[in-house]
Swiss-Prot record:
Keywords of the record: Aminoacyl-tRNA synthetase, ATP-binding, Cytoplasm, Ligase, Nucleotide-binding, Protein biosynthesis
Compartments in which it is found: Cytoplasm
Family annotation (Gene3D superfamilies): Anticodon-binding domain (3.40.50.800), Bira Bifunctional Protein, Domain 2 (3.30.930.10)
Family annotation (InterPro entries): aa-tRNA-synth_II (IPR006195), aa-tRNA-synth_II/BPL/LPL (IPR045864), Anticodon-bd (IPR004154), Anticodon-bd_dom_sf (IPR036621), His-tRNA-ligase (IPR015807), HisRS-like_core (IPR041715), HisRS/HisZ (IPR004516), HisZ (IPR004517)
GO biological process, any: L-histidine biosynthetic process
Protein name listed in UniProt: Histidine--tRNA ligase
Keyword field contains Cytoplasm: yes
Family as reported in the entry's similarity comment: Belongs to the class-II aminoacyl-tRNA synthetase family.
């Protein structure tokens, strides 16, 4: 028996209904901010990803050659593809551009809870805006999208300018190692490394910055910075909305990717793989041959959101089970079509079993049953049975439809 590939999943109808419902809530949340959906190919030229991340990323991707010998890769994320599309197709459009996306991505990594080889991202890119308002908007869009799902989470906001200031006088290799320790939250290891590297003087300011809970505490460590005004303005805009967040000036992800504001969000019940969103301000368009378009964006790990939510109660729609004799089947198709035209789900029994057996099957899922026998065919009516109360009445097709609709309210 052929099995599905490792790191992938099958979704049965109940799961898909839950996923579509949460996806729909997120789509509606970002739509209210003016974000419009875009889509890119599932596979891209390999260089799209290696030109920014280096050749080392190849081991983490699904890479192949097509019949023309071109090196291609299944997309491991969406931002690079969306910026490639901007450079190819949309540089002349009026900015800022508010784009959103929902799509599957692929990474060759060890599968575990909340981490898969095929996974879905929901995200936005705000292209062509370089202000505190742009930073605040994208954070709020992410917060709205996540909270629309019903998930409570912890939002952490930082700014790479403060950490870069403290590390301005160290070499690139040292900076990378410091950020790697911070990213892994190996603070004891960081202290030992700084002492070994002759940089013990950095231990105190780094420790104080990591412990800072307010902007005043953070700038007391760094002193005045050119970015301070923008950071404080962003904070004022966020505070005006009442959004719940805290500061983390030790966010070290994407040092070579993000240019200023960064943020992350963590579910409270996922353990080690608890991060559900990451984003920030960046400038990538030039890397792909475009103009220097400042951008802000985020990506939500949709699968982790679903894991964190647990069992999702979907909105149950009314179901009508249509049962009939073999002779009454043409009329049954007509009746079922009338319900569907009115927006009601109608399930036809396709077996040749008797009416009793068909009715018993319908009662397992349907709210109403429509019985069609010789009498109903002759009179052009139906027998409508409420499966919750057991009452049944001979009515016209139109009245049956109206009765079910009224019972759905």
């Amino acid at each position: 028996m052929v099995q599905r590939p490792r790191g992938t999943r099958d979704f049965l109808p109940d799961e898909m209904e839950a996923r579509r419902m949460i996806e729909g809530r997120m789509r509606e949340a970002v739509r209210r901010w003016g974000y419009r959906e875009v889509a890119t190919p599932i596979f891209e030229d390999l260089s799209l990803f290696t030109m920014r991340s280096g050749q080392g990323i190849i081991d983490e991707m699904y890479v192949f050659q097509d019949k023309g010998g071109r090196d291609l890769a299944l997309r491991p994320e969406l931002t690079a593809a969306v910026l490639r599309m901007y450079v190819n197709e949309a540089r002349v459009l009026a900015k800022p551009l508010r784009w959103c996306y929902f799509a599957d991505c692929f990474r060759y990594e060890r599968p575990q809870k909340g981490r898969y080889r095929q996974f879905w991202q929901f995200g936005v890119e705000l292209i062509g805006a370089d202000t505190a308002a742009a930073d605040a908007e994208v954070i709020l869009v992410a917060d709205n999208a996540i909270r629309s799902s019903g998930l409570d989470y912890d939002l952490k906001i930082g700014h790479l300018g403060l950490m870069k200031h403290l590390l301005a006088d160290v070499g690139e290799e040292v900076r990378r190692k410091v950020m790697a320790y911070l990213d892994k939250k190996e603070f004891d290891g960081l202290k030992d490394y700084l002492e070994t590297a002759g940089l013990a003087a950095l231990t105190d300011p780094l420790t104080r910055l990591l412990a800072a809970e307010t902007l005043d505490e953070a700038f007391a460590v760094t002193g005045p910075l050119p970015e301070e005004g923008r950071i404080r303005e962003m904070a004022a805009l966020l505070d005006a909305t009442g959004v719940r967040y805290s500061y983390n000036f030790g966010i070290a992800r994407g040092l070579d990717y993000y240019t200023g504001m960064v943020f992350e969000g963590f579910a409270k019940n996922l353990g080690a793989e608890s991060q559900i969103v990451g984003g920030g301000a960046y400038r990538l368009a030039q890397v792909f041959g475009g103009d220097d378009a400042p951008s802000v964006g985020f990506a939500i790990g949709f699968d982790r959101v679903m894991v964190a939510l647990g069992e999702v109660q979907t909105r149950k729609q009314k179901i009508v089970g249509v049962v009939s004799t073999a002779e009454g089947r043409p009329f049954a198709f007509r009746v079922a079509n009338a319900f569907r035209t009115a927006g009601i789900r109608a399930d036809l029994d396709l077996s040749d079993r008797g009416l009793g057996a068909q009715l018993a099957r319908a009662a397992k899922e349907a709210d109403f049953a429509v019985l069609i026998g010789e009498r109903e065919v002759a009179t052009g009516t139906v027998t409508l049975k409420n499966l919750a109360t057991g009452t049944q009445t001979a009515v016209t097709i139109d009245l049956a439809v109206r009765t079910v609709i009224d019972g759905s309210r």
